[in-house]
Amino acid sequence: MLKFTEEHEWLKIDGDVATVGITEHAAGQLGDLVFVELPEAGSTFSKGDTAATVESVKAASDVYCPLDGEIVEANQAIVDDPSLVNSDPQGAAWFFKLKLADPDAAKALLDEAAYKELVA
């Protein structure tokens, strides 16, 4: 199941684990990324908490945790090469995997059609 937030994160949900990243729209707005800071595995976050930080040539921005949960994995590849976020934001450049405290809460997030309407 693919879901989106109004803060421009995407979530690919598989059971009780969500893979989280930023959308193509967000990556395009940021411009070329030069730095990514990710949360550590084992960290817990509530919905809306700052979970990661990205810096581009234009600005620094926070990436918010879309739902309550625990980080089970972070994508070291985008720390090593932040430009991956610009080239494949909704694929190889995922940010972290989140074990959801309440998987049903994802139903309240935007579907792809609603997100496309938001950024149109």
Curated annotation (Swiss-Prot):
Is Magnesium one of the keywords? no
Record domain Lipoyl-binding: where: 17-99
Disulphide connectivity of cysteines: none
- UniProt keyword annotation of Glycosyltransferase present: no
Q: Which UniProt keywords apply?
A: Lipoyl
Q: Which InterPro entries match?
A: 2-oxoA_DH_lipoyl-BS, Biotin_lipoyl, GCV_H, GCV_H/Fam206, GCV_H_sub, Single_hybrid_motif
| Modified residues annotated as N6-lipoyllysine in this record | 58
Q: How many cofactors are bound and how?
A: Binds 1 lipoyl cofactor covalently.
What is the required cofactor set for this protein?
(R)-lipoate
Q: Which GO terms describe its biological process?
A: glycine decarboxylation via glycine cleavage system
Q: Which Pfam families match?
A: GCV_H
Q: Which SUPFAM superfamilies match?
A: Single hybrid motif
Q: What Gene3D superfamilies is this protein classified in?
A: 2.40.50.100
Q: GO CC terms for this protein?
A: cytoplasm; glycine cleavage complex
Function as written in the Swiss-Prot or TrEMBL entry: The glycine cleavage system catalyzes the degradation of glycine. The H protein shuttles the methylamine group of glycine from the P protein to the T protein.
**Similarity comment: family membership:** Belongs to the GcvH family.
Q: Return the NCBIfam families for the record.
A: gcvH, PRK01202.1
Instruction: Tell me how this protein assembles.
Output: The glycine cleavage system is composed of four proteins: P, T, L and H.
Identify this protein by name: Glycine cleavage system H protein
Q: What organism is this sequence from? A: Sinorhizobium medicae (strain WSM419) (Ensifer medicae)
| Gene transcribed to yield this protein | gcvH
